[in-house]
């Protein structure tokens, strides 16, 4: 695939871009800060200084805070509770997924990737998380773009970032191989 986006949903939300078959890092090397895309104009203040950033409504930290009002909740608890059908957990995931899909619609409209891969500690949720993301993507993307954009869950789990970084090092033209 020549054009894809990898999105990690964790305590932050970030994206890695492959455009034209090559990693894209932008002029400052900080491309992919999708977590700081404004989703709600009058939303909660974000640590970056803006308001209504995607991370303020859809990061795992926010999910844990919403679900942990009686006792602390981990990402493993979120996965386990969602898979067992807990209605509060499913609602939080549905809301977060819809917001993530809205953010991904902007990326899809802008670069028209062949596929968007979702990863991070919630990757085990598969369709439970992909379905609301897909709904948000389809609702906010140009119809033909939304329909043509593949959306899949990473099979690499929390290893995706490390494997991606290792791949970049191995592809580096200045790397001396022993």
What is each PLM-predicted segment?
Residues 1-57:
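Glycine-rich phosphate-binding loop of actin/hexokinase-like ATP-binding domains
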Residues 42-45, 50-178:
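ATP-binding/phosphotransfer module of carbohydrate and carboxylate kinases, centering on a glycine-rich
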């Amino acid at each position: 695939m020549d054009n894809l986006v990898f999105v990690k949903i964790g305590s932050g939300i970030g994206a890695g871009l492959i455009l034209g078959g090559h990693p894209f890092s932008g002029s400052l090397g900080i491309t992919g800060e999708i977590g700081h895309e404004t989703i709600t104009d009058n939303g909660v203040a974000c640590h970056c200084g803006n308001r209504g950033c995607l991370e303020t409504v859809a990061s795992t930290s926010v999910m844990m805070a919403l679900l942990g009002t009686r006792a602390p909740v981990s990402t493993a608890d979120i996965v386990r509770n969602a898979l067992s059908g807990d209605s509060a957990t499913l609602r939080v995931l549905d809301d977060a997924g819809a917001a993530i899909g809205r953010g991904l619609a902007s990326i899809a409209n802008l670069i028209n990737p062949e596929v968007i891969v979702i990863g991070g500690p919630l990757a085990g949720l598969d369709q439970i998380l992909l379905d609301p993301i897909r709904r948000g993507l389809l609702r906010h993307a140009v119809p033909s773009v939304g329909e043509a954009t593949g959306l899949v869950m990473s099979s690499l789990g929390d290893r995706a970032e490390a494997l991606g970084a290792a791949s970049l090092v191995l592809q580096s033209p200045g790397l001396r191989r022993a």
